């Protein structure tokens, strides 16, 4: 049998992991203890939901069935999903609705996002987008309109964008970077070997190219470049190390690593529930190779506690600059 075949490849499973079926697929009926947590309390959850619904907006929290929705909405934070809720791609991990012909852009959306930011009193806002390969600029101009609308009514708000790869359109990407968000995020999602299966319309190298272009900081010297990885899809520890090295090479400064959870039965199976000790191992390795900021854990998602991530990054940078 070949050395790199799935049957012999070492998965990120510790001995106490539940229900290993023998083929690397972990039974989904029982989550390990570290994937259980208490529900948050308080009425802020309803308040956040009301603001979003009244302004006719979408969030990735809802559309992608994020496990952190209750916690984040209780903390009065949400990741706005712009350009509709229909994506022109149908990635193997994502629960957002797929459409070959997404609905036209809503030109009132930027002002409604800005109003929601104001009503929620946000200090840091995360804007993500569906892929819009049906548009000549991939939706970059609409994303910039959202950024500008937020800034017009919320001067002190910091902005993080989580974008598609714009099909490699460097001009479209430059247009977004010129809007000077504080954080530019584009997720690599998985290791090189698994990319064709996990993100069939994206490529590993294109993602690195997008991040590298952003890391040049041509328009905004204080821009921080961020990317995220899902684990539990069948990758090995060595492949995660290689991916972290690639992210470091192209200038990525913030990396998030979290557990993949199957959003519905049509999507990719979970191959392993990764133990918290392994997440700590990834964090320590990333720091050892010079990535300044890593946030790794079972419930970590690319925009999870994004305001705290930016605050800690700025604090660490200030300490380094003062030495």
Swiss-Prot record:
Belongs to the radical SAM superfamily. Lipoyl synthase family. Its main location: cytoplasm. GO terms for molecular function: 4 iron, 4 sulfur cluster binding; lipoate synthase activity; metal ion binding. The gene is lipA. HAMAP family: Lipoyl_synth. It catalyses: [[Fe-S] cluster scaffold protein carrying a second [4Fe-4S](2+) cluster] + N(6)-octanoyl-L-lysyl-[protein] + 2 oxidized [2Fe-2S]-[ferredoxin] + 2 S-adenosyl-L-methionine + 4 H(+) = [[Fe-S] cluster scaffold protein] + N(6)-[(R)-dihydrolipoyl]-L-lysyl-[protein] + 4 Fe(3+) + 2 hydrogen sulfide + 2 5'-deoxyadenosine + 2 L-methionine + 2 reduced [2Fe-2S]-[ferredoxin]. Pathway: Protein modification; protein lipoylation via endogenous pathway; protein N(6)-(lipoyl)lysine from octanoyl-[acyl-carrier-protein]: step 2/2. The keyword S-adenosyl-L-methionine applies. Residues 73-292 form the Radical SAM core domain. It is found in: Cytoplasm. This is Lipoyl synthase.
């Amino acid at each position: 049998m070949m050395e790199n075949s799935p049957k012999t490849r070492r998965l990120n499973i510790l001995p106490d992991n539940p229900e290993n079926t023998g083929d690397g697929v972990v039974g989904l009926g029982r989550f390990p203890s570290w994937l259980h947590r208490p529900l948050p309390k308080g009425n802020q959850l309803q308040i956040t939901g009301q603001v979003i619904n009244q302004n006719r907006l979408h969030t990735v929290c809802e559309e992608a069935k994020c496990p952190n929705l209750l916690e984040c909405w209780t903390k009065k934070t949400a990741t706005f999903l712009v350009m509709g809720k229909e994506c022109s791609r149908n990635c193997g991990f994502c629960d957002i609705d797929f459409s070959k012909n997404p609905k036209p852009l809503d030109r009132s959306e930027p002002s409604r996002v800005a109003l929601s930011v104001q009503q929620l009193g946000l200090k840091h806002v995360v804007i993500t987008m569906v892929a819009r390969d049906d548009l000549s600029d991939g939706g970059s101009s609409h994303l910039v309109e959202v950024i500008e609308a937020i800034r017009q009514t919320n001067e002190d708000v910091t902005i993080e964008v989580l974008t598609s790869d714009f099909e490699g359109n460097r001009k479209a990407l430059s247009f977004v970077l010129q809007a000077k968000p504080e954080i530019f995020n584009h997720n690599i999602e998985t290791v090189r070997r698994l990319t064709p299966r996990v993100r069939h319309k994206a490529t590993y190298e294109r993602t690195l190219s997008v991040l590298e272009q952003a890391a040049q900081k041509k328009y905004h010297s204080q821009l921080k470049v961020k990317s995220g990885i899902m684990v539990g899809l069948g990758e090995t520890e060595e492949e995660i190390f290689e991916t972290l090295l690639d992210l470091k090479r192209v200038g990525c400064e913030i990396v998030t690593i979290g557990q993949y959870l199957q959003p519905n039965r049509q999507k990719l199976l979970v191959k392993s529930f990764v133990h918290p000790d392994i997440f700590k191992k990834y964090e320590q390795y990333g720091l050892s190779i010079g990535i300044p900021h890593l946030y790794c854990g079972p419930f970590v998602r690319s925009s999870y506690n994004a305001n705290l991530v930016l605050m800690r990054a700025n604090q660490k940078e200030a300490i380094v600059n003062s030495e």
